[in-house]
């Protein structure tokens, strides 16, 4: 198509060019319609990258050195520069290196991680896990955890194993990698390139036989433990008059952090896990944090500088909190699987290695002594060691003498039975007396040895064996959990409610406020929360909402007396409490039915409130 036909074609004039930057330093150039939705663009990017699970990723644009994530329901041109929306005929011709020059300069968009998870097994798609790994790689390069310097060397070893495979002497020598691509700049400056190139090959060699997928999992698990890697940072102002932001808001996987900006460093002021955040309120540019358990006078008030930034932070905080709460049962299950696998590996290596060591030592001692008693003792020890070897493996000597088809259950039960061993501790502890002066010991020494041989010791706790036999849990590197869109935007999942949008009318004025509330935990976690809270207190105003629940009957009585006043009360349920006086399940189910979609919120007011209280508890507002 020539330029004249291109400018006369209205359809082509509505086309624009976008450049998508990927976490692995690659880019995609796409021609799209100027009125496309952000969700449609994200789908196109995932199709080009062959991503099946993209719920942890998002599209962002950089505004004032901050990544602003797009609302998928909005149109793309709301986030683009003004020049990008102009007609193609009015835009100067751009360089061909950016794509088709007729569509003008491309809009720069970043495809990056929006929601962090602490375990790579939560990412079902390997391609998504690959880009998640690369995103953390870039974050690690900017990390400043000076007290965790050893972690960067371990991360570099995992990354080299994932990128280059097993260490090979004839291939991986000298400067076979760039230290700047695997270490933060301050580590390279402190240690020097020669130091890194000298010691990292040995650590790379220790990761032998790890596949790329396993190395990605280990890298993700270790990288998120650094305090400043899996974090989103946003500027905050102490008051409206500030020109330069003096505070920084850090959104982590587990909560919110507030930092004081000091020259080139950040000093941590507050660290609020999600369980300690009572409510977040955005009123225009004002941002309020109400910590759980503190009186209302102790709330923290900051400013975002723009109502749009307030809305963006509210959505990001609410979705991150919802995902964190919904993933807790899954994470507990994964930790249990991994712990059982580690115990099993440790148990097998412990039995096998110690018995092999005992056999080698006793064999040398028996040869050195040359006595008949020593040889007799060696035969007896070899019999015990053989029995113990059959216990440490599922297919022991008895399995060889009686060949038959065994399933996984049979092999597991047989290994559990063979774990009942006769101990060899007495013989190893008295090994010197057996090899040097056994004949002079007489009958007393032989009787003691016979008594020691009759002692039986259980290598494993029977309760552990019963529990493992019932669960029979196995972990594989390819095991993964699917994160669905329901975990971010669902109405109810795993007992955790979504956003509740209500219109609350004030008794003193005719105006209404849009209150967005998020319920944090299900009834399953309620007893754990109550165990952490004191049941008695001398000052009721200093109690959290969980403590106020203990005085619900008093509040119901107060509400009846003060119903005609200007104060407003909102209670979690109006039914009577159960025998324990803790919760009303029928009211929770009724409220979960009335849950609305998370966003967009009606723009009838500039007041947004995010309530992160853990339970359906009465709210006492004075």
UniProtKB/Swiss-Prot annotation:
Phosphothreonine carried by residues: 523
Biased composition (Low complexity): 384-395, 425-438
Modified-residue entries (Phosphoserine), positions: 522, 525, 542, 544
Any single GO CC term annotated in Swiss-Prot or TrEMBL for this entry: cytoplasmic side of apical plasma membrane
Signal peptide feature range: none
A family per Pfam: FERM_N
Protein name: FERM domain-containing protein 6
Organism, scientific name: Homo sapiens (Human)
């Amino acid at each position: 198509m020539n330029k004249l036909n291109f400018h006369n074609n209205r359809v082509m004039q509505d086309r624009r060019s976008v450049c998508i930057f990927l976490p692995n330093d690659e880019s995609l150039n796409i021609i799209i319609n100027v009125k496309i939705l952000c969700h449609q663009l994200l789908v196109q990017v995932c199709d080009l990258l062959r991503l099946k699970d993209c719920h942890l990723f998002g599209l962002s644009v950089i505004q004032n050195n901050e990544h602003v994530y797009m609302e998928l329901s909005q149109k793309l041109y709301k986030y683009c520069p003004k020049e990008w929306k102009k007609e193609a005929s009015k835009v100067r011709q751009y360089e061909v290196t950016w794509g088709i020059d007729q569509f003008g300069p491309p809009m720069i968009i970043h495809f990056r991680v929006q929601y962090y998870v602490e375990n790579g097994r939560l990412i079902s798609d390997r391609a998504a896990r690959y880009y998640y790994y690369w995103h953390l790689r870039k974050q690690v390069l900017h990390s400043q955890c000076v007290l965790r310097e050893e972690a960067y060397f371990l991360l570099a070893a995992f990354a080299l194993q994932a990128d280059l495979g097993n260490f090979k002497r004839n291939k991986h020598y000298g400067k076979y990698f760039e230290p700047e691509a695997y270490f933060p700049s301050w580590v390279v400056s402190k240690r020097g390139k020669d130091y890194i190139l000298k010691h990292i090959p040995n650590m790379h060699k220790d990761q032998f036989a790890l596949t790329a997928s396993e190395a990605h999992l280990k890298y993700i698990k270790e990288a998120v433990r650094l305090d400043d890697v899996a974090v989103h940072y946003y500027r905050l102002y102490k008051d409206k008059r500030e020109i330069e932001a003096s505070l920084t808001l850090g959104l982590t996987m587990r909560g919110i952090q507030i930092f004081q900006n000091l020259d080139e460093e950040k000093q941590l002021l507050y660290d609020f896990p999600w369980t300690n955040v009572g409510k977040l309120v955005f009123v225009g540019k004002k941002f309020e944090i109400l910590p759980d358990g503190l009186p209302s006078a102790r709330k923290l008030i900051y400013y975002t500088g723009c109502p749009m930034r307030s809305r963006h932070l509210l959505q990001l905080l609410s979705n991150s909190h919802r995902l964190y709460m919904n993933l807790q049962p899954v994470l507990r299950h994964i930790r249990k699987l991994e712990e059982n696998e580690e115990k099993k590996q440790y148990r097998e290596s412990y039995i096998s290695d110690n018995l092999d060591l005992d056999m080698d030592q006793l064999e040398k001692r028996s040869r050195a002594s040359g006595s008949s008693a020593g040889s007799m003792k060696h035969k007896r020890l070899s019999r015990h060691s053989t029995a113990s070897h059959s216990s440490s493996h599922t297919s022991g000597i008895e399995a060889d003498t009686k060949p038959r088809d065994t399933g996984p259950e049979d092999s597991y039960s047989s290994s559990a039975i063979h774990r009942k061993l006769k101990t060899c501790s007495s013989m190893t502890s008295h090994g010197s007396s057996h090899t040097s002066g056994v004949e002079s010991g007489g009958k007393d020494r032989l009787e003691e040895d016979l008594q020691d041989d009759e002692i039986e010791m259980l290598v494993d706790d029977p309760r552990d064996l019963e529990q493992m036999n019932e669960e029979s849990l196995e972990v594989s590197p390819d095991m993964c959990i699917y994160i669905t869109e329901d975990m971010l935007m669902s109405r109810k999942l795993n007992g955790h409610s979504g956003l509740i949008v209500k219109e609350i009318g004030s008794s003193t004025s005719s105006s209404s406020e849009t209150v967005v509330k998020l319920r944090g935990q299900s009834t399953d976690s309620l007893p754990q929360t109550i165990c952490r809270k004191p049941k008695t207190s001398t000052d009721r105003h200093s109690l959290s909402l969980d403590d106020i629940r203990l005085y619900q009957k008093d509040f119901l009585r107060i509400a009846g007396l003060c119903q005609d006043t200007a104060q407003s009360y909102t209670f979690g349920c109006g039914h009577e409490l159960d025998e324990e006086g803790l919760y009303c399940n029928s009211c929770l189910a009724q409220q979960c039915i009335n849950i609305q979609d998370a966003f967009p919120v009606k723009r009838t007011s500039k007041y947004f409130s995010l309530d992160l209280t853990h339970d359906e508890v009465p709210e006492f507002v004075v």
